[in-house]
Amino acid sequence: MRSSGRKKEQIRPVKITRNFTKYAEGSVLIEVGDTKVLCTASIEEKVPPFLKGSGEGWITAEYNMLPRSTQSRKQRDINKLKIDGRTMEIQRLIGRALRSAVDMKALGEKTIWIDCDVLQADGGTRTTSITGSFVALVDAVNKLHQKKPFNVYPIRHFVSAVSVGIVGEEKILDLCYEEDHVAKVDMNVVMTEEGEFIEIQGTGEAGPFSRKELDELLNLAEKGAKQMIQAQKDALKTDSLWIGTGRE
């Protein structure tokens, strides 16, 4: 039993609040345990120069932690005059994860900006950002679809993310900060509803791990990703019915 009372294969409570802010086409507050992230999706009727004239859209992400989202104050990137490596890595991960879910040709020449602001961090901020941002993305795309229906609905499948790790000798799902801090192995896994992998980021923090342990962690991640997708479906309700249909 973990310090929180959770079983090793149990995720933290998930709460997804849609339409959390007024102006963004999609906005979500996602809470996974004590980790809280505001995710917004904003639409621009243009694409980066390398996509002009291609007929394809683009999705890109920015990630930020509020200064007191952590136990001690974290300096804003803007005050350091550069984006730190961790922030850059995470926002690229979020962008890749969401682009994998979308038919860019069906989206057309539009850019969807995903902004993830961590309000409170207690482990799993990148995976929480991906899970919440997907819901914000669906809301933004649905608003486009209501204004002018797509010939083919562009979102192809659900995407969620979850962390897994080895703490002591136990393989556990959805690590909080206390667990992440002492984990021998720490892994972030992004998956589709069909059980396909989009990205696997794994590190042996305290030494190597075996292929058997890797397989066990991935099996655990698949269980967690399904639970996260169910939370997305519960939040979206009937607004998710177009996903994966490719219908006109």
UniProtKB/Swiss-Prot annotation:
It is an enzyme of class 2 (transferase). Phosphorolytic 3'-5' exoribonuclease that plays an important role in tRNA 3'-end maturation. Removes nucleotide residues following the 3'-CCA terminus of tRNAs; can also add nucleotides to the ends of RNA molecules by using nucleoside diphosphates as substrates, but this may not be physiologically important. Probably plays a role in initiation of 16S rRNA degradation (leading to ribosome degradation) during starvation. Phosphate binds at R86, G124, T125, R126. Homohexameric ring arranged as a trimer of dimers. NCBIfam families: RNasePH. It comes from the Bacteria. One of its GO terms (biological process) is rRNA catabolic process. Gene3D superfamilies: GHMP Kinase, N-terminal domain. GO terms for molecular function: 3'-5'-RNA exonuclease activity; tRNA binding; tRNA nucleotidyltransferase activity. This is Ribonuclease PH. The gene is rph. Coiled coil: none annotated. Keywords: Nucleotidyltransferase, RNA-binding, rRNA processing, Transferase, tRNA processing, tRNA-binding.
